[in-house]
Amino acid sequence: MLRLNDVVLKDVVSYHSFFSKQAPGVKGPTIEKFLKRFEYNAPLDLYQVVDLEDFNLFFLDFFFKIFPKNLSIFDRQAANIVTANIIWSYRSWRHFKGLPCRGQRTWSNASSCYRSNLILRDYKKKNVRKIFGKYGGPEQKICFLCEYINYLWKSQWFSEWMHSRKWIKYTLKKKKVVFYLDLYATSKGLLGNLRSDAKGVTKKKKKMLTGHVGFDQGFTKIYLKAKYAVSKKVRRKLSLR
């Protein structure tokens, strides 16, 4: 047995058995593409578990993270974006990140990079429409950026995110208070100011953050619901703030 990432992989004696048991949907052509992209000359089944202590576990760890652990459609969707971006066009992924590939310049292989970006753009559009509905292109982009910035603050600056969340709840409890949320400014990272009595917040972040973050996931969908639930005549008079 092989233990990786605090998970015991049962009956895994080689990379080949790992593919057949832990990576559903991976067949021979996919394995050959990996071997070609990462320039592995030896077959995967030659690396046994007993030799993995001396062998670099990066390759196996890479597969274990990107492939889903079951046949759930949500895990499969999460893996599709990785397979489309790395497996199908590893060179394009390197060029997109501004990194050289096999000694080439970053400006080369433009056609494959263009095709890869088209596939990724269509994939993102489909996912955004599933989350936010059939909104226009600009609204989709704004919603996606607002959700991303809100999640970024929650994951990296949780104390500031919680302070903004408490400030929002405190403001909404007041009577005759209209809470304005500027989605355009939030999508550009212009988040305003915190209260001067904020504790545990640096001066730099006080100038960047107010009640524009601190929301639950999907807050933009609820915020835009009123805009797209009215008639066309009234909709023309409304605008995102």
Curated annotation (Swiss-Prot):
Coiled coil: none annotated. It is found in: Mitochondrion. Keywords: Mitochondrion, Ribonucleoprotein, Ribosomal protein. This is Small ribosomal subunit protein uS13m. Belongs to the universal ribosomal protein uS13 family. GO terms for cellular component: mitochondrion; ribonucleoprotein complex; ribosome. InterPro entries: Rbsml_uS13_C (IPR027437), Ribosomal_uS13-like_H2TH (IPR010979), Ribosomal_uS13_CS (IPR018269). Transmembrane segments: none annotated. GO terms for molecular function: RNA binding; structural constituent of ribosome. One of its GO terms (biological process) is translation.
